[in-house]
Amino acid sequence: MGKRRSRGRSQLLSTMTKKQKKHLRDFGEEHPFYDRVSKKEVKPQICQLSESSDSSHSESESESEQEHVSGYHRLLATLKNISEEEEEEEEEEEEEEEDKEEVDDSAVGDSEMNGEDGGEDVRVEETAESSETQDHMSLADNSKGKDGEEPPGVSQKSSEEFTDVKHESLFSLETNFLEEESGGSYSQRTSQDPFQHHINKELQEKEIQAAASSPAATQQLKWPVLGHLVFSSKFQKMETFKPPKDIDLKSLHLQKPLESTWAKTNSQFLSGPGPQKSSSCFTPLQKELFLIMNSYRDLFYPERTALKNGEEVRHVYCLHAINHVLKANAQVLANNSRRRTQKLGVGDDDDFRDQGLTRPKVLIVVPFREAALRVVQLFISLLEGDSKKKIIVSNKKRFQGEYGSDPEERPPNLKRPEDYEAVFVGNIDDHFRIGVAILQRSIRLYAPFYSSDILIASPLGLRTIIGGEGEKKRDFDFLSSIELLIIDQADIYLMQNWEHVLHLMNHMNLLPLDSHGVNFSRVRMWSLNNWSKYYRQTLLFGALQDAQINSVFNKHCVNAQGQVAVRNVPMTGSISHVLVQLPHVFQRMEAQDLASVIDARFHFFINKILPQYRDAVMSHTLIYVPSYFDFVRLRNYFKKEELNFTHICEYTQRSGVSRARHFFLQGEKQFLLLTERFHFYKRYTIKGIRNLIFYELPTYAHFYSEVCNMLRATSRGEEATWTCTVLYSKYDAQRLAAVVGVERAAQMLQSPKSVHLFITGEK
């Protein structure tokens, strides 16, 4: 009966127009104009609720096939597919707005337009404003709310998290032994293997104390592909190296079966013509990255972009991660076999110290489920290769269902920049965490964290399990023995919630609060001494140089093997991609220190910049604000001063966004406040811009040219009056160099003049 009812609802929906569906969804009933008047009198039906869902289900099957579809059922039918319909309508409305000069009045609503007062914001926006601030404030404190859950992706986290409990003994390191086929190869590699050299390195207490107080020794090198590298270390004499012209797989000490499977897994990057093809099974970029990874130094690579080399980088760090896990587990299993065959004497246990305080040894932090899916697929491919015998992957179907996506879900008419399409591909839910256990040629997905070798999670997924001070349910012991931390696409976390990343780093490699059944006779001494952070390798990948990302790398990465950072400087800048003829006025503000920059920028803006735009002649002014907290401060100030403005942020409802864009285009609102996070997640083209103010330089340099090029969307002969003003300080050196180039940025920061003019688009 339930199937018949759903068919009836779907048939009913198929006969309704889009306007009827919208009215039904908004008001819970159809418009009276479309009422179907039945000539027969319908008797009222009295329904009694059953005590259990089972009895109600059995009774419903005995009912007749014909039933009266009430307005309530029609509403439920629309709500069932509301997300899909809203997405389709949203994209269609966007396309219409991109093609037309004005927004369709029916999308805005005549009654809402007539009731809009010139000096006040839209009522719907006002009701959402109180929750906006509360939601965003709660992100940093409680990690709850809308962080990262932008309109493109809604969290799919269920109340009950699934974990695999069936295969515990099969993947246990305590009860399994090394297979004969891989046992011999392991012992042959121990002497020169960089893995063994790293974990067997013994630090002294004096070295730890000296490293805490002494500055790091640095040395700069230039590599053919990576470019300018900075080697640094606090623990040992500076050792640098240059990549050889070609490398042999055997010299890399890859664990079986990676020597044979890597070539096939990486073949997609080697099949093309030109210099990418190499006999070493690595691309030139992968070769240099893996040489640094395999030396167990920390690495910061800020040129990983989803559009250009994202998959290339993902392949090489997955190879390093699974190589590390296979070696670590092979050592444990080999020692299990040795302990079983020989009798232990007094003090012999020190020869078998091969574990940490907890089993998880690799943590991979990625922003979306799609990235986690690709990482697991790479692990399967690296273990399987050309082998005719398929490896065992438990819960694979469930994993693909929860982390995969339906290609038909994305509207075909969606037009966005290529970099947007590359980032927001597949399942973009940002709340997830999954444990992966690997034992020789078998993979266990959804393994309990304390039975896992590799943890794959988003910052939000980790934040909700780590918890905060005072919370009853919190757990971070699984982070105590992480030996390899991979943070991929770090720039996206700036658009989600960077506080989650800082919270994670503050809980890395702490002593566990519980033993979790560990055999202390097998735990390495440096782990017992709470020195795990000095043995942890951190690989940090992002698309840009940013002060917050640099701070994490400099503060939290203290690997005894040293650090390597790629420090290439942009020579041209994104301002060269501005196509419109536009004067760019860069105004430098002064601040005593980094802590006072926020207040200095605000007072400089309201005292020096804003008075120039209060005149009605300077209408159609867009103010681009990268920080949400600056946005809230400006919004409150504009309200206090009763300025004629509207605003769009990442929490504004879709209807509010449409109205704000319409009012700004028509000139009914003089100012439009726009957050960078909204632009990152939506990439709307804001029409009607004549004056542009960058309250702060954008995080992504290419956003500068994108926003500037929006001025040509509604060109009506006002090109001569267009203006662009940019605020910057000496603390914005990296962002300034990314926009104007490193040479111009140096001149602008050192010049006694505080105002600099650039003109683009000249013929």
UniProtKB/Swiss-Prot annotation:
Residues that span the membrane, as ranges: none
SUPFAM superfamilies, A to Z: P-loop containing nucleoside triphosphate hydrolases
Ranges where the record places region Promotes p53/TP53 degradation: 1-190, 580-642
Stretches for region Disordered: 1-164
Cellular localization per UniProt: Nucleus, Nucleolus
This protein's GO CC annotations: nucleolus; small-subunit processome
UniProt entry keywords in alphabetical sequence: Developmental protein, Nucleus, Phosphoprotein
InterPro entries with a match to the protein in the record: P-loop_NTPase, UTP25, UTP25_C, UTP25_NTPase-like
Phosphoserine sites (modified residues): 10, 52, 60, 64
Compositionally skewed regions (Acidic residues) per UniProt: 84-119
GO molecular function, one term: rRNA binding
UniProt biased composition (Basic and acidic residues): 25-43, 54-70
Post-translational modification remark: Phosphorylated. Phosphorylation is required to promote p53/TP53 degradation in the nucleolus which promotes cell cycle progression and liver development.
Region ranges (Represses p53/TP53 degradation): 643-704
Role played: Component of the ribosomal small subunit processome for the biogenesis of ribosomes, functions in pre-ribosomal RNA (pre-rRNA) processing. Essential for embryonic development in part through the regulation of p53 pathway. Controls the expansion growth of digestive organs and liver. Also involved in the sympathetic neuronal development. Mediates, with CAPN3, the proteasome-independent degradation of p53/TP53.
Membership in a protein family: Belongs to the UTP25 family.
Subunit structure, interactors included: Interacts with CAPN3; the interaction is required for CAPN3 translocation to the nucleolus.
Designated name of the protein: U3 small nucleolar RNA-associated protein 25 homolog
Highest classification ranks of the organism: Eukaryota, Metazoa, Chordata, Craniata, Vertebrata
Primary gene name: Utp25
